Swiss-Prot record:
Molecular functions per Gene Ontology: glutathione transferase activity; maleylacetoacetate isomerase activity
Pfam families in the cross-refs: GST_C, GST_N_2
Residue intervals of the GST N-terminal domain: 1-78
Family designation: Belongs to the GST superfamily. HSP26 family.
Record CDD domains: GST_C_6
Chain residues that bind glutathione: 9, 49, 62-63
Gene Ontology cellular component list: cytosol
Name of the protein: Uncharacterized GST-like protein YibF
């Protein structure tokens, strides 16, 4: 099994962590989708990462589909509840965390443009998306929808999203007034799977 992606992608990191937590052996193929000579399109015609390539050569994309495929392999520990509705609730929170990653990626791309071409309105929109979503996640931790000691698909996605914000210095004050969220990500960052997938220093 091969995972095609970039070491800096939070979506790729989420899937690497799922595989590591389940003890599933895989080969990592480092491809930078924004490089002109990248080989991603041979695995995904959209040219996007991550892509999971099975032993039979079947290619799975994108991130939520791959996460579901990994879970369907029925390798312990389970990262989704057995109950379909509870599982869908976890997937909803995963989608929220993935949205934070998307907003972070858009912010990074916007800030990479020449200063005169950057849109402050666009950056503000993305910051607002991130902050609203982080507030909702903090609320889930306060009301018990999420717990700080839980390891599942949703909490892994949340920690990968926050890890990306830290890595790219997007929303630098995210931890202010969100103590439960801080506790959750600290617990997850201490796990071996997170240590092994930490993005390389610039």
């Amino acid at each position: 099994m091969k995972l095609v992606g970039s070491y800096t992608s939070p979506f790729v990191r989420k899937l690497s962590i799922l595989l590591l937590e389940k003890g599933i052996t895989f080969e990592f193929i480092n491809e930078l989708p924004y490089n002109a000579d990248n080989g991603v399109a041979q695995f995904n015609p959209l040219g996007k990462v991550p892509v999971l390539v099975t032993e039979e050569g079947e290619c799975w994309f994108d991130s939520p589909i791959i996460a579901e495929y990994i879970e369907l392999m029925n390798v312990a520990p389970a990262m989704l509840p057995r109950d379909p509705l509870e599982s869908l609730r976890v997937r909803k929170i995963e989608a929220l965390a993935d949205g934070i990653m998307d907003a972070g990626l858009v912010s990074v791309r916007e800030q990479a443009r020449p200063a005169a071409q950057q849109s402050e309105d666009e950056l503000l929109r993305q910051r607002e998306k991130i902050n609203r979503s982080l507030d909702v996640l903090e609320g889930y931790l306060v009301d018990g929808t999420l717990k700080t000691d839980t390891v599942n698909l949703a909490t892994i996605a949340i920690a990968c999203a926050v890890g990306y914000l830290n890595f790219r210095r997007v929303a630098p004050g995210w931890c202010v007034d969100r103590p439960h969220l801080v506790k959750l990500v600290e617990n997850l960052f201490s796990r071996e799977s997170f240590a092994r997938t930490e993005p390389p220093k610039a």
